[in-house]
From Swiss-Prot:
Gene name linked to the record: BASS3
Record-given protein name: Probable sodium/metabolite cotransporter BASS3, chloroplastic
Organism annotation: Arabidopsis thaliana
Presequence positions on this chain: 1-70
This protein's UniProt keywords: Chloroplast, Membrane, Plastid, Transit peptide, Transmembrane, Transmembrane helix, Transport
Transmembrane segments: 110-130, 145-165, 169-189, 198-218, 238-258, 261-281, 288-308, 325-345, 387-407
Function: May function as sodium-coupled metabolite transporter across the chloroplast envelope.
One GO CC annotation: chloroplast envelope
Topological relation to the membrane, as annotated: Multi-pass membrane protein
Primary location class: membrane
Length: 431
């Protein structure tokens, strides 16, 4: 079967439309039109008014049988492919996880969805034209990271931390996965691949930082526990003031000297202070937060781009060397295993969590704040040690959101892959 369609940019959500009527058509060649109209969404204003608000497919029936139909979003959100059997008929599934998710969409989701593409473009720009990011000095790196942390803080309230006392088990499981399993996995991977000393300490440091802010968006895509994701990310980020210097001293202190006290002070300045400021603003200055919230996701995205591009451009020659290219396999391996480890650790008898919580812990374990690791590596270990952290941002953003999209769809990979193979079903589709 071959489906040919010329699609303009579709709206962020599509209502479900059954194709059961199609099977009642006579066997001879006839046409059947389906229109999939958009539902209301807070993001509707983001789309140009000149764009069509519906998709129109014309299916031509030639023989008896079923017509598999694929719907793929080309909105700024992660594209989704849905294939759903119901009573022997096919249905188009709604985009973006349903209307309830769409109604909660805001600018933060829009910029978060763009982040993987911005990360990839930043890496390409930094390596192909280093002057585009070499101007980002260490003096600018810390404020940029502070901007990312402030964007976390303005989303928090005192009530959020009260959840920690109501749900201690999943939070504890996430902490253990973050600060025990992940650092040990990093040491195992680094030694297994014989990572050179040029990058070893920076790689281990990257494995010892807290979860990334992007994991909260990934949790929403994967239909996981978003509230737990925000709580876990925020808590581990605050706890990094103690755990990251402690783990770094224990795991890499024998390789390179680590000033744990100075590192703790640095984390306090660029992590805890901005988050606390954001929390205070969200508690006592709501009008200020109302003004900041629409722009902070964009600010965080720009800051992330600067924190990635700087170490990549400065260390371009080392990255493109044989040793630098050798980082790809261990970093991909680390993140892939970390996602699996976080998920299955939460399924151990006695600790077993609900599926939504397990997905959250998996994403928080596999996606860490590599930008923080890059800053600490630049300040305390040398500029070359920041390279693993910069590479990690690119890998974890792409892998994490792909995993989240897969979970969010709820469909098997082989169902999606089978659609790319032409089959003789006797149907064609014309847009």
């Amino acid at each position: 079967m071959t489906l040919i369609a010329s699609l303009s940019l579709p709206p962020p959500a599509i209502q479900r439309q059954s194709l059961s009527e199609f099977h009642n058509l006579p066997a001879k060649s006839q046409s059947f039109n389906c229109q999939f109209r958009s539902s209301s969404s807070p993001l509707s204003s983001l789309h140009s008014s000149s764009l069509s608000n519906f998709l129109d497919f014309r299916l031509r029936r030639r023989n008896s049988g079923l017509v598999p139909v694929v719907a793929c979003s080309t909105t700024p959100f992660m594209g989704r492919v849905g294939l759903h059997w119901r009573d022997g008929n096919m249905s188009l599934l709604s985009f973006c996880g349903g209307t309830d998710v769409t109604e909660k969409a805001d600018s933060s989701q829009f910029w978060s969805a763009l982040l993987p593409f911005v990360v990839a473009l930043t890496a390409v720009a930094a390596l192909s034209y280093p002057p585009s990011f070499t101007w980002v000095s260490k003096d600018l790196y810390a404020p940029a990271l502070g901007g990312i942390m402030l964007s976390i803080g303005i989303q928090l309230s005192v009530d959020d931390f009260a959840l920690a006392f109501k749900r201690p088990v999943p939070l504890s499981v996430g902490f253990v996965a973050q600060y025990v399993l992940k650092p040990l996995l990093g040491v195992l991977v680094a030694n297994a691949f014989g990572m050179p000393r040029t990058f070893y300490a920076g790689f281990i440091l990257t494995c010892c930082v807290a979860g990334a802010q992007l994991s909260s968006y990934a949790s929403s895509l994967s239909k996981a526990d978003v509230a737990m994701s925000i709580l876990l990310t925020s808590s581990t980020t605050i706890a990094s003031v103690i755990f990251t210097p402690l783990l770094s001293g224990l795991l890499i202190g024998s390789v390179v000297p680590v000033d744990a006290v100075a590192m703790s002070k640095s984390i306090l300045q660029v992590v805890l202070v901005p988050i606390t400021l954001g929390l205070v603003l969200n508690t006592y200055a709501k009008p200020v937060v109302t003004l900041l919230q629409p722009v902070m996701p964009f600010v965080a995205m720009v800051c992330t781009s600067l924190c990635i591009g700087s170490p990549l451009s400065i260390n371009r020659s080392q990255i493109l060397s044989a040793e630098g290219l050798g980082l790809i396999v261990p970093i991909v391996t680390f993140h892939a295993v970390a996602f699996a480890l976080g998920y299955w650790f939460s399924k151990i008898p006695g600790l077993r969590q609900e599926e939504e919580v397990s997905r959250t812990i998996s994403l928080c374990t596999g996606m860490q704040s590599s930008t923080l690791a890059g800053l600490l590596a630049s300040q305390f270990l040398g500029s070359s040690q920041a390279v693993p952290a910069a590479c990690s941002v690119v890998v974890m953003a792409i892998m994490g959101l792909c995993l989240a999209s897969f979970w969010g769809n709820g469909f098997r990979i082989r169902d999606v892959l089978s659609l790319s193979t032409p089959q003789s079903t006797g149907y064609t589709a014309e847009s």
